[in-house]
Amino acid sequence: MARPKRGNQVPPPPTEDEWDLRYATKEALAFPEMEKQFPGNCAEAKSRLKVAPTTRTDVQEKLRGSLGTRAIAGSEMDQWQYDIASGARLWYCVDPEKRIVWLTLAAMGHPRSTASKGKRAPRNR
């Protein structure tokens, strides 16, 4: 299988009533590797995002603050997070007019940009 590129569709293609999943950034291009490590969780994530990308669940939430919106192709969109597995996260933006879910980040560890600044977890002694 060829390596994905920005703008490419995430396979498989959507059915008539599903949302289209696409790669928006180079940081999202790690999603196929994530699928290899967490195949079941990623398959469930794709299914949920194709049907209800803006539904808040125990694994899906809108990001807050400066991370809550992002510009893609000149349009400002809400940015969401899907918790694939402990530490593995998928960020995405939703374009309701075109019914496209733009993947913006596939991170195997917790993204640094969501960590609280100046606060560290207590060390185990």
Q: Where does each model-flagged region fall?
A:
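Basic, Lys/Arg-enriched alpha-helical interface segments
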Residues: M1-A88, V94-R125
